[in-house]
Amino acid sequence: MKFSRSRKFDFPTEFTIGNSGTLEVKTEHKILGVMVQNSLKWDSQCTEMVRKATNCIWVIRRMKSLGVRQSLLVQYWKSEGRVMLEYACPVWHSGLTVAQSRSLDRAQRVAMAAITGRWERSHSAQLRELGLERLDLRRQRICKRFGERTANDSRHQDMFAVNPNTRTRGGKDIRYLEINARTSTYYKSALPYLTRQLNNN
């Protein structure tokens, strides 16, 4: 897999191992359950997560037809369906487009419709009724918790550079030096985003 947007250095990728021939160059690959594309976008990851969550929605419909209580259906969605839409979210959350975020939200809305037996125009009202949360807010909280645990873990403290001058002129505490990103893609990637989240207390 080749990661490069440069036209000047866009050379053909060829790797050979002994006499086994040339390795195939792929545009996407699954790494620890996360679909990574050479374009550094998350279309394939979102599609895969929605597909897995949709399988759980089918089970919810089946359980509802058998008379399973609504509270148990909600619990099943939380433990089996929603987790599919949040898998490894610290890696990809900051790089989502609006359309990708909406596709994840729609999967939860379909699940809520399957649980209640009706489609509500008001997303917020149905979330409150079932005791669920917006996915984007949950992802933000998960990312911040992940960043805090990583920063406090002695094995990974080198990921975040500690700011020697924690106080700025505006009086805001800046615990970690933020990464200077020359491109919007890098700015929206995981490490710069997590650093900003750690500084936003």
Predicted regions: what is each one?
Residues 1-27:
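Short, conserved micro-motifs composed of acidic
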Residues 3-6, 18, 35-37, 193-195:
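Structured loops at beta-to-helix junctions and adjacent beta-edge loops in soluble globular domains
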Residues 11-14, 43-46, 139, 199-201:
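Short conserved micro-motifs at the rims of enzyme active sites and ligand-binding pockets
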Residues 21, 42-49, 66, 70-77, ...:
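Generic alpha-helical structural element
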Residues 22-91:
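Basic, alpha-helical interaction scaffolds
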Residues 75-78, 84-85, 89-99, 109-117:
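Arg/Lys-enriched, amphipathic patches
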Residues 97-201:
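Short linear motifs embedded in intrinsically disordered, charge-biased segments
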